[in-house]
């Protein structure tokens, strides 16, 4: 029976980050993955002469060597993963109707705090002070988060009150409540709320801290994409893990997590046999793991209640298009465009609960930033929408293909109508992924690759402050989208690194007796 200091289940962003952190610390670590490639959602696939990015729109918290974000620091500087990529020059373009139901919005917002603020003032005269206050508070919140990390969450209350008073003031409020407190004009709020779909919860409930952190990181560091899709990122982490002495088994399914008489982890049962270990870092959804991989008697009642109280987050539907015209020929100059019927996030969230009413969409043209993303004279375009409920559960198997093709056609039509650009005649390759696809490939409940909703009671701040109670099964910790910081590549990587550090701390305590 092979024995390891730690076993990491699942080679998604969180699992790979955890595996690298453990190997970097010199621990004998095994990574097991049921597929034949790493990445989970962070991957790519080929159709014809096109290679499609599976999930990444743009990576947050990355930046450049001169303006590096924490995610880049972890992956490149600490883990030593050599990566080349492109900075996305604008944060986003948004095309929608304002929450007043009348005003048309079509705006491009640049990177950089000063440029972003100037552009907002051009779009909404008189909003400058509220935007400046937003970024000032955002900087304070980022600094507070970095301080918390530097002391492993053991913050000093007096120090927090002296140095981060606004962080404490806004910590328990939603995005919309803080925007109103900042006296931000309604139209400015509509534009500033554009990114809500990246966290998939409406701004009435979305934690201001979570949203502020994300927007500030995008604006301050810029968004980034790897040259060769997410597959380059995840295979790069895998190669570094192996170079640091780690073992990786692919086509290997973890079937059960094993426990001793003290209800502590003692091993993992796989389709290749049993692996002995005292520590498991699981890149999976706790609801699925508790239901299928862990004996019920070892799970504390609180963890069952917590998993049941949480709501599965957005379920992805993506149309992948390989076009036989270049982005320049088609006039596709914007990298990322948010196309919403309304800037009212509550209305859009509720519309996203059914197949028929969901009309929210984000387009990404990778060639607008990376000219070599596809063969010369071509471009790759993705259209993504999110379902806020398990709407696909009611689709009959015999209706599946027709349903997904009908929705894909509706999304293509919306793109063409909104931008006044015809793409249908130039579609060389098309693939459609539904929540069922996500269920199959990454084994997430309802196809929810975003983990659990970051609701007001279950926000990033709440999870971070309660880290000690999030992992009550001895020897088992969760990483990835369903972990402490929610969805997003950077958040998954952060969770993997953080949970690995906590595991290393547990190991040290065990060694010290």
What are these regions (language model features)?
Residues 2-140:
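N-terminal glycine-rich phosphate/pyrophosphate-binding loop and immediately adjacent elements
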Residues 56, 481-503:
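A conserved FAD-binding loop/helix module that cradles the flavin
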Residues 99-206:
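Rossmann-like flavin
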Residues 185, 189-202, 358-364, 421-485:
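A glycine-rich dinucleotide-binding beta-alpha-beta segment and adjacent secondary-structure elements
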Residues 212-265, 271:
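Helical element adjacent to the flavin cofactor pocket in flavoenzyme catalytic cores
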Residues 255-375, 470:
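Mid-domain catalytic core of redox enzymes
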Residues 259, 505-513:
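Active-site-proximal substrate-binding core of FAD-dependent oxidoreductases
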Residues 326-436:
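C-terminal segments that line or cap access tunnels to active or ligand-binding sites in enzymes
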